Every structure is written in C-alpha cells, then in structure tokens.
C-alpha cells in the first residue's frame, strides 16, 4: 500500500483519461486521516475545480449546514470524490472514467480505513455498492436506499443524497436532514449496549455480528429495543433489534 503523500502526488499528475484536458485542478481527498466517517461525492464542481478544494461552492455551504445539524465538525471526517476531475458541463461520469479513477478511491479507503463509507448521490453509491457486492436499485428508485445503513465485508455503508439536492426547494428536505443526522450516531455506540443482552449473546457466539454493527454500533435510534428501553417498556431478552424474537436465544 502506498503512502498518502505518494497517492496524492500520483492523483495530481494523472493524465489517464480525457478529463485531464478540461480540468484546472485535480482534487485529492482531504480531512482527518484517522476519520471514522468517509464521505464520497461524485466529482468536483466548478468552484472546487477553480480553487482545488473540496465542497466550497453552493453544495459545500449546504453540506456545512447539514454537518452542523448533525453536530459533526469537518475536522472529524474525510472527504473525497469518485472522480477526481470536474466533469465538463456537469455531465454524467463515463464508465471508463470511473474504472480509471476508482483505483485512487480504493487506495484512499485502504489508507483511511474508515468504519463507515458515506457515498453521496447515485454514482458514488452505485460504485460503492458494486465494490461491496450490494444490490442497488435503478437510478429512479435509488432514493429508497438513502439513509439506510448497510454492513458488509466488515464495513458500514450509509448512502445519502448529495447536498446539491437541497439547492432547490426539495420536498424531501426534512428526510434528507434526518438522514444526515444519522452520521452522528455512527460515532458512538448505543448507551444501552454495555448492559444489552445483544452484547452478551454476540460475545457468546449466539448472535450474528450484523445485529451489533447495524444497530448497537450503528443506527441505534431505529432499534426497537432501544426505543422500548427509553420508554420503560418491557421487552424480552431474546427480542432482536428489529422487534422480532429469536427463540433460540431463550433457551
């Protein structure tokens, strides 16, 4: 595995596809090299191409607002793009461009080794889903996976809408904000985890790790056990985070 400095030098010198002919700057990833969260956008915009920095245009302002609402500092995360050069006229990335540029993204993932990958928008989500052998719906239905946490091959994946979706009057504004706020949960375990039966069952080898990663150390606010615990409601030890029961845990 190459060093982060060596990787950025290679990215900045890249002339492997047609995009090198129209760009001003190549955008390397930036942020916390020990980040637990790694945001992956599609490609730089015009402002980013001119200044050589991530998320500084209108979408960047929206992202900053979303991070504030999620109580997350930019210094806590690492940000990068699937495509490192601006796409002319904001066109869609071509398959050969994705194939060439994704090698750099794969190196970044190995170097940063975040606990959670957060692809923003369709093309970034499509690539990450394919890389980790997950099924993604068609582009017209891709919104159904946004805000849903996945766990595969030892990595969490939380696809989100691109901040640009809020540049106009989007009827899904509140949903998008809620989805972004889920990032904060991924930085800390459920407060009930130390005494939760799920932890004991997992440590005893009786419970699949996915339950721990998706709920206890993931989207724990959606956990039925968490909700009932918060409300002081009775729930059996063998009830799973999604509200179903596993009688094998009752034995």
Q: What is each residue range found by the language model?
A:
Residues 1-184:
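A polyanion-binding, active-site-adjacent surface
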Residues 185-251:
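Cysteine-centered metal-binding/redox modules
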């Amino acid at each position: 595995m190459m060093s982060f400095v060596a990787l950025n030098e290679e990215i900045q010198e890249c002339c492997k596809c047609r995009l090198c002919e129209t760009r001003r700057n190549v955008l390397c990833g930036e942020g916390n090299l020990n980040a637990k969260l790694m945001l992956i956008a599609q490609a730089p915009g015009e402002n980013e191409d001119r200044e050589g920095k991530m998320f500084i245009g209108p979408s960047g302002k929206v992202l900053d607002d979303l991070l504030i609402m999620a109580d997350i500092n930019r210094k806590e995360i690492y940000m990068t793009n699937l495509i490192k050069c601006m796409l002319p006229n904001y066109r869609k990335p071509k398959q050969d461009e994705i194939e060439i540029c994704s090698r750099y993204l794969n190196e970044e993932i190995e170097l940063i080794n975040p606990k959670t990958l957060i692809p923003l928008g369709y093309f970034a989500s499509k690539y990450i889903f394919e890389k980790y052998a997950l099924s993604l719906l068609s582009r017209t239905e891709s919104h159904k996976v946004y805000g849903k946490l996945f766990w595969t091959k030892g990595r969490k994946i939380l696809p989100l809408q691109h901040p640009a979706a809020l540049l106009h009057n989007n009827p899904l504004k509140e949903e998008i904000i809620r989805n972004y706020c889920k990032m904060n949960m991924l930085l800390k375990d459920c407060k009930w985890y130390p005494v939760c039966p799920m932890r004991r069952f997992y440590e005893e080898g009786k419970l699949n790790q996915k339950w721990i990663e998706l709920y206890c150390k993931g989207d724990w606010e959606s956990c039925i056990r968490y909700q009932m615990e918060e409300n002081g409601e009775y729930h059996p030890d063998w009830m799973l985070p999604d509200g179903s029961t596993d009688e094998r845990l009752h034995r």
